[in-house]
């Protein structure tokens, strides 16, 4: 950490991110923040707020908005604009980047895995000129009781659709790296074009998996939003001051195209 409490990246960590497409930050989030995030995740899931948020994305009217956003939960809002995280992102993509979206979930013990995919939103397909980053925050860490994250180093340099490897399920692939042991509060930063998969936990002892992911896009191109209520999301980020007065582009609308409903 530097004298402002920000994790200072070494040059080789920056180089590894660009070469491999991911960066592992064990125990990155302080226990105090994790302790406030977990009950907010419980509320988000148990009250039906998560389901209503998903339903709002399926609303035929782009103006439809959910009653509450993840970033309106106090600790989630802090996480979206968490200064040490944004400082690291600025080291990777430069000083101007914009918040894209946040997802929060508590997965049941023994939940199924998720097939190989990537989450890069830029189009057309051949455009990889700017970087999108997904920050995967594992509140309870990772171990065999919650499954593992498998990543395919270097695959972020491919020009491929999100589901180009989905037919493979979660099978082991040559060259993959499996991240399966991380302490509570750990974060994995992914170049969003990196192929990755969620491996289910093996049979036996299992526990719930708490994860919040937030994504950020390098400025310089127009990014497609994934939520029809994206303007409302950005406006709330500005109103709540989640940029901390330091990142003026973090919730700026001008970096997005219009929302297009998936076909």
Task: Give, region by region, the residue ranges found by the protein language model.
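A short beta-loop-beta micro-motif enriched in histidine and acidic residues
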Residues: 121-132, 175-176, 182, 207-208
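Short, structured patches in soluble enzyme cores that scaffold and shape functional sites
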Residues: 103, 118-120, 137-141, 151-153, ...
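Short, conserved beta-strand element in jelly-roll/cupin
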Residues: 126-144, 181, 215-219
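Double-stranded beta-helix
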Residues: 142-199, 221
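Non-heme Fe(II)-dependent double-stranded beta-helix
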Residues: 1-19, 26-125
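Short, surface-exposed loop/helix-turn segments at secondary-structure junctions
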Residues: 116-119, 164-173, 203-206, 227-232
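Non-heme Fe(II)/2-oxoglutarate
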Residues: 2, 194-195, 199-263
């Amino acid at each position: 950490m530097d004298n402002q409490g920000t994790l200072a990246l070494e040059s080789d960590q920056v180089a590894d991110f660009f070469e491999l497409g991911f960066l592992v930050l064990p125990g990155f989030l302080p226990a105090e923040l994790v302790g406030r995030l977990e009950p907010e995740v419980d509320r988000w899931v148990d009250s039906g707020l998560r389901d209503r948020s998903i339903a709002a994305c399926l609303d035929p009217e782009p103006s439809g908005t959910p009653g509450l956003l993840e970033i309106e939960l106090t600790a989630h809002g802090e996480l979206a604009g968490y200064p040490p995280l944004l400082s690291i992102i600025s080291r990777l993509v430069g000083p101007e980047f914009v918040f894209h979206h946040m997802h929060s979930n508590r997965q049941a013990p023994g939940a199924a895995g998720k097939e190989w995919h990537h989450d890069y939103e830029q189009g057309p397909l051949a455009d990889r000129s700017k970087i999108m980053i997904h920050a995967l925050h594992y509140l309870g860490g990772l171990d065999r009781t919650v499954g593992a994250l498998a990543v395919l180093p270097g695959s972020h340099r491919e020009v491929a659709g999100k589901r180009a490897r989905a037919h493979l399920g979660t099978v082991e692939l040559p060259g993959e790296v499996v991240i399966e042991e991380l302490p509570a509060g750990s974060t994995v930063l992914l170049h969003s074009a990196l192929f990755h998969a969620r491996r289910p936990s093996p049979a036996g002892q299992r526990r719930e998996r708490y994860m919040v992911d937030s994504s950020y896009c390098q400025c310089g191109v127009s990014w497609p939003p994934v939520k029809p209520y994206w303007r409302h999301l950005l406006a709330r980020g500005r109103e709540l001051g989640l940029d901390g007065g330091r990142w003026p582009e973090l919730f700026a609308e001008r970096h997005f195209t219009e929302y297009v409903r998936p076909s």
